[in-house]
Swiss-Prot record:
Its EC number is 3.2.1.40. Its main location: secreted. The lineage of its organism: Eukaryota, Fungi, Dikarya, Ascomycota, Pezizomycotina. This is Alpha-L-rhamnosidase rgxB. Disulfide bonds join 374-380. It comes from Aspergillus niger (strain ATCC MYA-4892 / CBS 513.88 / FGSC A1513). Glycans are attached at residues 67, 77, 97, 103, 112, 135, 219, 239, 247, 278, 344, 387, 395, 414. The gene is rgxB.
Length: 429
């Protein structure tokens, strides 16, 4: 193993990055600064140097990645951070050793998902200046997994776990291995000016390349994101509360997802107080869509499950701009079940209620504004849709259809027909 390269610097030698960083730690002492020196070769794993820097300067200090490439050849678990500033000026490049990652990826703690890096702690500032980059070498993964959904042990790129008062800003994520970012057991944190591009160079959809997933988290703000991918742009999953998504542009993916949820038999989960505003959609499938598992447990996560309890409520989306949406902007499906099985779309005990969608305009490929495939056991309640101006791309007609199944209480629209009941997780057939 190459020797660990770690350089201790005085604060006065550092050019202060673009966000407001302090030369003093929370305790009033001057910050210790660690600059990670790259090994300079893909054969040299830079993880030992990174972990050493975060150990030395991870409490009241600053860790600097210079404008170089750092080779990430092994997993990282750095959850002890406290009042630390991480300054990424270069690129973190993950290796393409699929066998290693499948055998060593770390558990996320939800849906049997795995990850390459778990990062957590208190008062973390992670600054990328708009060019600091995570490169997951995703093309190798997209070819390897093919059409297999949730390939076992395929890692998320970054998991923010147990963080409080964190700020992640100006980071670029390209070619993520799977989900770009999972945010779990985290609170009072801000993720701003994040760029994600997970397109598959060989064509087709790079599935499971979500921009971000919130899980068991509260008071999370995601602003000024740009996501180009083949799956959920951003997803709020189990026990996500007080989440704000604003001033974002989403391209090519499925749109903002609530779920999937209701996957664990008998478990009570919620998504509450989600605020979505000022979003631009470029050729996504939907604007906002809901996906819950059926009332029957078939198999186990990540590709099986069902029978979960709970509700999604107090969800508001406003000021949405679309360019050639592929499907209805607002959909609900309660049909998710084991991969390859046909689910019962009407027996979920997970309820969806108190939704407000206002001020959506642009173009769409669908004549449907909404497709709500709700459970008969726990019908959807109190849905408002107002100020819709969606022109069907290529002509002058407008989307005016509202398809409903088991919906009680509508404001601003009337249901115009029955929803197509099918096993699609995205509310269509």
């Amino acid at each position: 193993m190459a020797p660990i390269a770690l350089k201790i610097l005085l604060f006065t030698s550092l050019i202060v990055p673009s966000i407001s960083l302090s030369d003093q730690a929370r305790n009033g002492h001057a910050r210790t600064i660690c600059e990670v020196k790259p090994g300079g070769s893909s054969e040299i794993d830079d993880v030992p140097a990174i972990v050493d820097a975060l150990t030395t300067c991870g409490s009241g200090g600053r860790v600097i990645f210079s404008n170089n490439t750092y080779h990430i050849n092994s997993v990282m678990n750095t959850t002890w951070l406290d009042d630390v500033e991480i300054d990424l000026q270069g690129t973190l490049l993950w290796s393409t050793n699929i066998s290693y990652w499948l055998n060593h990826s770390l558990p996320v703690g939800y849906q049997n998902q795995s990850t390459a890096w778990i990062l957590g702690g208190k008062d973390i500032v992670f600054e990328g200046h708009g060019y600091g980059t995570f490169n997951g070498s995703g093309q190798t993964w997209y070819r390897y997994v093919g059409s297999t959904s949730n390939y076992p042990r395929r890692p998320n790129q970054l998991t923010v776990s147990g963080a409080m008062g964190a700020v992640f800003k100006g980071l670029r994520f390209v070619q993520s291995q799977m989900w770009t970012m999972s945010i779990i057991h985290t609170s009072n944190s801000w993720f701003d000016s994040i760029y994600v591009n997970n397109l598959y160079d060989d064509g087709g959809s790079a599935q499971n390349t979500d921009g971000a997933n919130t899980i068991y988290s509260k008071n999370i703000t995601l602003t000024n994101w740009e996501v180009v991918n083949g799956d959920d742009s951003i997803s709020t999953k189990a026990n996500s509360t007080d989440i704000t998504i604003a001033n974002c542009t989403f391209t090519s993916g499925l749109g903002i997802a609530i779920g999937s949820i209701g996957q664990y038999n008998g478990a009570f989960e919620t998504v509450e107080r989600l605020k979505i505003s000022n979003i631009t959609y470029e050729k996504t499938t939907h604007a906002v869509y809901f996906k819950t598992w059926t009332g029957d447990q078939v198999g186990y996560p990540p590709n099986g499950g069902g029978g979960g309890l709970g509700y999604a409520s107090d969800i508001v989306a406003t000021n949405l701009k679309t360019n050639n949406l592929k499907g209805a902007p607002f959909t609900i499906s309660q049909c998710t079940t084991f991969s390859g099985a046909s689910g019962n779309c009407t027996n979920s005990k997970f309820q969806i209620r108190d939704l407000v969608f206002t001020d959506i305009s642009g173009t769409t490929d669908s004549s449907d504004v909404a497709s709500f495939q709700c459970s008969a056991v726990a019908p959807c309640e109190d849905i408002t849709i107002e100020n819709v101006s969606l022109r069907i791309a290529g002509n002058t007609t407008h989307a005016e259809e509202y398809l409903c199944g088991n919906v009680d209480g509508t404001v601003g629209f009337n249901c115009t027909g029955d929803v197509c009941v099918g096993s699609s997780a995205t509310g269509g057939c």
